[in-house]
Amino acid sequence: DDVTDLDERRKRGHGDPGGLHIIDQISIGMDTLQGRDPHVVTMGFDEHNGPLYPFTLQQKLDSITEPCSWYVADGDSPWGTPIVPTEMLSVLAHKHGPHLPVRRPSVGLFIDLEVRYVNGPVFVGRSYQLDHQVVGIGQSRRVESWWTETTLTDLETGLHAATVLLH
């Protein structure tokens, strides 16, 4: 695979992150399911997307700045079925909300996002298994943060459809 700028920034964060207080119970390599069954998710046009994203795909499509006929049910997707917009893959990947031992109170921020299609695209209404792993931890003077890599596996084909790296 090609190395991206985000890969380089993440690798710089692989050293000792120093004295952590809020995310001190998180470690690189941690499976964020922590023994629970894998998450299986879909993104339908009218279903809500969990506690972090209280809107539907249709609501997003109604306000999207760059509409595409491949995103809609009666569109002309070359796959014969609508696809999930790239900007919504982080929503799908984190539909079940955070599942890491983070001390509260804390505020969640998204710093970086990278989506890699492997055997994509990701289809509306299709089921995907999510596998999450912590791949980096770091801090600045005021912020503690971690990187989560989520693999989306298409349950219909068994193929790795996409990877979402969220910092």
Label every PLM stretch briefly:
Residues 22, 34, 44, 50, ...:
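Generic structural signal for short, flexible, solvent-exposed coil/loop and linker residues
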Residues 1-32, 119-167:
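HotDog/MaoC-like acyl-thioester-processing domains
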Residues 45, 96, 113, 131-133:
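Generic alpha-helix detector with strongest preference for long hydrophobic helices that associate
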Residues 2-82, 167:
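Non-catalytic linker/capping segments at the edges of enzyme domains
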Residues 62-110, 114-118:
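Active-site helix/loop of acyl-thioester processing domains in fatty-acid/polyketide metabolism
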